[in-house]
Amino acid sequence: PEWKWEHIAMDFVVGLPKTKTNHDAIWVIIDRLTKSAHFLPINERYTVDRLVDIYMREIVAQHGAPVAIVSDRDPRFNSRFWRSFQECVGTKLNMSTAYHPQTAGQSERTIQTLEDMLRVCVIDFKGTWDKHLPLIEFAYNNSY
């Protein structure tokens, strides 16, 4: 990557306790150059359309459309709608494979760090961990 937010990685942290606002997962989106990240609270059952809306508002509106995205083979990232949308904005999709998991290694390390931070918050904040996610994101992005 030559410019920030040009190449990104993304994955989901799932299986979290449901919050009062019905969030039970976090969409982790990482800039592969600067290692900075966005932690977006979602519900695992959100449609791809809803995820595209969030992505447009939280990523594209702030950073522009990336040149390339590395992600796992989650069905949401493999859907026709997601692929067509990314093609329209000129973003290349790179799926990590079971044989080459290092392609998603950066997002996996970020997710592990996030999960460690979240464990403390979930214990302390119970059903409101999503309200504290911006502070966790700030702490993560200012810790290196």
Where are these regions (language model features)?
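Integrase module of LTR retroelements
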Residues: P1-Y144
